[in-house]
């Protein structure tokens, strides 16, 4: 390891691992729901559409994702600290890819939690079919909006893989 401060490196890794735990807890809140035979897709689930899923859970999911994303940043710092200083372009690419990963994770947490909230809120109020249509339309509209977040990361990684940036 090339880092001058191994205790700080370990500290950053621990903070990043805790951040991953927060993000996993948010995912667990969304994923651990009772399933029915009629459930299909991510949000066409009776538990959401009946209003049984607590409206506070998607809000907590976003909060856990935000805290997790913030703490995961320390893993990005730890990985960056281990790259030799003479490889400055590589360090920059790795750092930017790490930041884009955190931004994408937080965006996806927010997006998925919002759809769960919409399904839970709208299901009992406007009916199951209308709620499914609304959530599906939201999902279809948001996916193209999220995809550009991946472009800088792919471009940076493609440049790094090409060898010119090392």
Where are these regions (language model features)?
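Hydrophobic, aromatic-enriched alpha-helical segments typical of multi-pass transmembrane helices
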Residues: 2-166
